[in-house]
């Protein structure tokens, strides 16, 4: 979001992360592999690393739940976003989901800026930002981003429900 922030101050970010099992380490990757094999044989699975079955499933909980209903990972995303952007007043709302993908995380973002910024300007800023590649001819996927040192950004579009807002999809390892 830094290239967008350079064009117009970001007021609000709404994000849903789709985090690979590699985020839970080798044990998380092993558990996904074992559960897939067990389920394919018709066997019952018993989660150890994750709070629920991860194979063929999504779990909207990374970390532990706090009293306000958020998880520790969601609070971390909120705080890190503000810190990285050097924007103490940046409003960040996040839901973190563990998905049955071995490597590479994805994130769906909706970003609201203080001023209207054209899609062309946003796309150009993303293209010019180091370590980021704008993908316009297909949807970037975690498989494509795996073992890569860049973040792929795609599906850049205006949010039809809010002024000065854009939505985009990112994948990175």
Task: Annotate each predicted stretch with a short phrase.
Residues 2-125:
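Active-site-lining helix/loop region of Rossmann-like oxidoreductase modules
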Residues 91-173:
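C-terminal active-site/capping subdomain that shapes the small-molecule cofactor and substrate pocket
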């Amino acid at each position: 979001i830094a290239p967008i922030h350079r064009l117009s101050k970001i007021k609000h970010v709404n994000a849903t992360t789709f985090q690979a099992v590699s985020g839970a380490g080798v044990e998380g990757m092993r558990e996904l592999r074992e559960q897939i094999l067990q389920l394919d044989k018709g066997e019952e699975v018993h989660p150890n690393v994750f709070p629920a079955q991860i194979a063929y499933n999504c779990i909207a909980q990374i970390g532990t739940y706090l009293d306000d209903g958020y998880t520790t990972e969601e609070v971390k995303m909120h705080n890190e976003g503000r810190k990285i952007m050097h924007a103490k007043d940046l409003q960040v709302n996040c839901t973190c989901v563990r998905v049955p993908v071995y490597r590479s995380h994805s994130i769906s973002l909706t970003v609201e800026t203080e001023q209207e910024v054209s899609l062309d300007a946003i796309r150009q800023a993303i293209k010019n930002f180091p370590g980021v590649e704008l993908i316009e001819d297909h949807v970037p996927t975690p498989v494509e981003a795996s073992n890569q040192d860049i973040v792929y950004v795609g599906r850049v579009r205006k949010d039809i429900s809010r002024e000065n807002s854009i939505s985009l999809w990112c994948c990175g390892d």
